[in-house]
């Protein structure tokens, strides 16, 4: 399902934030020298040397259980890197580190800075704004986002809602450049294939969100999306959509149905669908912070959004969970894999 995307614009997107306009100049004015010095100091504060961050102790605390290349448990310690990270040597003749084949493999930027990046995302800061705040190239911020997507791609698999469960669909437009129009140039009305359907559900403790295709969803798509994420016998609070029938009958759900027209004009406190409506509002705000993203990556954004909204609710605890997940369920993504072929975003 190609939903359209946005291409990284030009080489300026990958320009190093470390550079100033006067790096090759010999005679600077007092103003230029002041600005250059101040800018460089702030850059270095944001980008400390790895050996100065103390992260070697963190990385070394994750002791590998097997070789990331061959899977063998026959390996031994073999000294340290210049940054103090434990090196291992396997019987297959491969050397590796605790970070090998994880999202932190071959990194040049400290995990501490990646932590700040995650905290910004949790606050709905766009990656473009984060790029400027942390003085990173835009491509670096984009690369980190793809690594985060990689880490969270299976995140929702184990989430099961129970008890009172609110479920409803919302819609998000395809990217403007990919809008399908009528022959006269006008837009299609209603829930056309220019609208991407997102199914969301919550039990007020956790949420799940899944892309269900374009236009109005079907019973099959809704069933496939939520069947493994709602406990049998739960109570489903939803609107009177026929697309929910198969899900309700298969899981033997108690159904509380409401007509959308009967809920119009109600205060939030009186609206029985308010718990899921609030999720939809937050989801739109989150997506709008990244409005030019490739819609083919929409499910990745759903995984990230649910991670942001679900427990633990303390942001630093979320970062700790991601770091642990990165080492315990390692997945890697090389920079060249992401940008070498000039992928669409």
Residue ranges and their predicted role:
Residues 1-345:
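Residue-level recognition of single "structural anchor" positions
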């Amino acid at each position: 399902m190609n939903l359209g995307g946005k291409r990284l614009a030009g080489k300026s997107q990958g320009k190093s934030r470390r550079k100033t306009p006067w790096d090759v100049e010999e005679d600077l004015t007092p103003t230029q020298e002041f600005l250059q010095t101040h800018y460089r100091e702030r850059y270095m504060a944001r980008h400390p040397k790895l050996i100065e961050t103390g992260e070697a102790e963190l990385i070394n605390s994750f002791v590998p259980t097997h070789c990331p290349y061959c899977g063998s448990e026959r390996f031994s310690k073999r000294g340290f890197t210049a940054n103090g990270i434990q090196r291992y040597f396997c019987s297959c003749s491969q050397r590796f580190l605790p970070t090998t084949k994880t999202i932190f493999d071959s990194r040049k930027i400290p995990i501490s800075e990646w932590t700040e990046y995650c905290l910004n995302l949790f606050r709905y800061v766009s990656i473009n704004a984060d790029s400027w705040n942390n003085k990173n190239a835009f491509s670096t911020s984009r690369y980190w986002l793809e690594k985060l997507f990689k880490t969270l791609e299976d995140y929702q698999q184990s989430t099961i809602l129970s008890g009172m469960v609110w479920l409803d669909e919302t819609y998000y437009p395809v990217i403007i450049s990919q809008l399908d129009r009528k022959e006269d140039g006008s837009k299609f009305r209603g829930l056309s294939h220019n609208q991407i359907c997102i199914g969301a559900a919550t039990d007020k403790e956790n949420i799940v969100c899944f892309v269900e295709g374009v236009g109005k969803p079907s019973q099959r798509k809704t069933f496939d999306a939520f069947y493994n994420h709602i406990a049998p016998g739960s109570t489903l609070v939803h609107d009177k959509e026929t697309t929910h029938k198969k899900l309700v009958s298969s899981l033997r759900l108690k159904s509380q149905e409401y007509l959308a027209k009967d809920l119009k004009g109600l205060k939030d406190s009186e609206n029985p669908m308010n718990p899921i409506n609030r999720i939809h509002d937050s989801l739109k705000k989150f997506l709008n912070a990244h409005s030019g993203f490739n819609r083919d990556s929409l499910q990745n954004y759903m995984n990230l959004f649910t991670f942001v909204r679900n427990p633990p609710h303390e942001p630093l605890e979320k970062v700790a969970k991601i770091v642990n997940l990165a080492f315990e369920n390692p997945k890697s993504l090389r920079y060249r894999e992401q940008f070498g072929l000039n992928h669409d975003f």
